[in-house]
Amino acid sequence: MDVLGPGQGNNTTSSEGPFGTRANATGISDVTFSYQVITSLLLGTLIFCAVLGNACVVAAIALERSLQNVANYLIGSLAVTDLMVSVLVLPMAALYQVLNKWTLGQVTCDLFIALDVLCCTSSILHLCAIALDRYWAITDPIDYVNKRTPRRAAALISLTWLVGFLISIPPMLGWRTPEDRSDPDACTISKDHGYTIYSTFGAFYIPLLLMLVLYGRIFRAARFRIRKTVKKVEKKGADSRLGASPAPQRKKSANGELGSREWRQGVENKAGGVLCANGAVRQGDDGAALEVIEVHRMGNSKEHLPLPSEAGAIPCAPAFFEKKNERNAEAKRKMALARERKTVKTLGIIMGTFILCWLPFFIVALVLPFCESSCHMPTLLGAIINWLGYSNSLLNPVIYAYFNKDFQNAFKKILKCKFCRR
């Protein structure tokens, strides 16, 4: 979205502007050849990567059946939207930036602004739809399995486009100021104060608030589940240490006699002290049995551990199994912490990228129309802010698809042309 067109940030005349621009007597910046070459290369690369990345996501979902589910339909629709931004909007925006003035006429300018606002708003709202789908999936997993249908995904996608139309169309119907069309070399969004508030809050600030709330609740729900799992593991480990272990049952042979393996019983512990049991489990014909169990006293003697009769029970859990349970519990705790850190990292990347790309743009979009006469925006800074927002269409497929292993496998198949051989 172009709030500040190239060369429009400063109406005063200067001999040399930032990044190789020169202002002429009318205040409209001319550009040097080096500026045009460098800008063309940078923006051309960005557009090419955005088109390629989003096209690969769409192709992967269309060709790989394992990716054809409701969650990925939303990601695929986001990729289609960002592909539209890359194909319909960015080339005209790049031409505007390279030439440093609008040369395509007023009708094309109106169409460009409408497509710009429509596609960028829909892209942002797709991120909200994905967040909402993930929120329902993690907070109500049992019921949402039946509700998570293609029809529901289609309804969410349609809503994103409807809101985009409601925000992009009003300027074409006259919700603008007379000054918006006063300069034939400029093509910027409507600076009407009412439309500025309506469009910025509808396209960004309300979706941003919704995403912060949803991902905050997703994080709390995920952390609660992870910690609940850890507590269950710890409780199970504690119960196994405190509880008695039942004696192994001895199977009878065909003639009705007990198995040949005998239990050693009746050891007498006269000296007292700390006993530590060490055992080895062996699978025999008559089932699993603790065959060699010895007691090591902290003193010098060595005795056999009293073992249970058929109706008896081992008086204490063997240390070998206690340590094993403790190791398992510790491993589960570490895995849970790793999952929690991964959740924080993933949500941080999603929200951090979105805010980094769009917040500077929408701050300028909201503030500039109210203080245009007194605010000074350097040309280079305005260009960076505009293209930082556009770059979100390049980063979305990386965040939502390329980090996913299923998508990675599909991309490998595409690169190796495995789908072509079917």
Swiss-Prot record:
Q: How is its activity regulated?
A: G-protein coupled receptor activity is regulated by lipids: phosphatidylinositol 4-phosphate increases HTR1A-mediated activity.
Give Gene Ontology CC terms. dendrite; plasma membrane; synapse
GO MF, one term, reads: serotonin receptor activity
Q: Which residues lie on this side of the membrane: Cytoplasmic?
A: 60-73, 133-152, 217-346, 404-422
**What residues bind 1D-myo-inositol 4-phosphate, as annotated?**
K345, T346, G352, F403, N404, K405
Topology within the bilayer: Multi-pass membrane protein
Provide the residues annotated with a glycan attachment (glycosylation): N10, N11, N24
Keywords recorded for this protein, A-Z: Behavior, Cell membrane, Cell projection, Disulfide bond, G-protein coupled receptor, Glycoprotein, Membrane, Receptor, Transducer, Transmembrane, Transmembrane helix
Report TM segments: 39-59, 74-98, 108-132, 153-174, 194-216, 347-370, 379-403
Disulfide bond entries:
C109-C187
Compartments it resides in = Cell membrane; Cell projection, Dendrite
Q: Where is this region: Disordered?
A: 237-262
Q: GTP-binding: present as a keyword of the record? A: no
Q: What is its main location?
A: membrane
The Gene Ontology biological process annotation of the record reads:
adenylate cyclase-inhibiting serotonin receptor signaling pathway; behavioral fear response; chemical synaptic transmission; exploration behavior; G protein-coupled receptor signaling pathway, coupled to cyclic nucleotide second messenger; gamma-aminobutyric acid signaling pathway; regulation of behavior; regulation of dopamine metabolic process
Residues annotated as binding serotonin are D116, C120
The UniProt similarity line reads: Belongs to the G-protein coupled receptor 1 family. 5-hydroxytryptamine receptor subfamily. HTR1A sub-subfamily.
Reported function? G-protein coupled receptor for 5-hydroxytryptamine (serotonin). Also functions as a receptor for various drugs and psychoactive substances. Ligand binding causes a conformation change that triggers signaling via guanine nucleotide-binding proteins (G proteins) and modulates the activity of downstream effectors, such as adenylate cyclase.
Subunit structure, interactors included: Heterodimer; heterodimerizes with GPER1. Interacts with YIF1B. Interacts with GPR39 and GALR1.
**What protein name is recorded for this chain?**
5-hydroxytryptamine receptor 1A
Q: What is the lineage of its organism?
A: Eukaryota, Metazoa, Chordata, Craniata, Vertebrata
User: What gene is this protein translated from?
Assistant: HTR1A
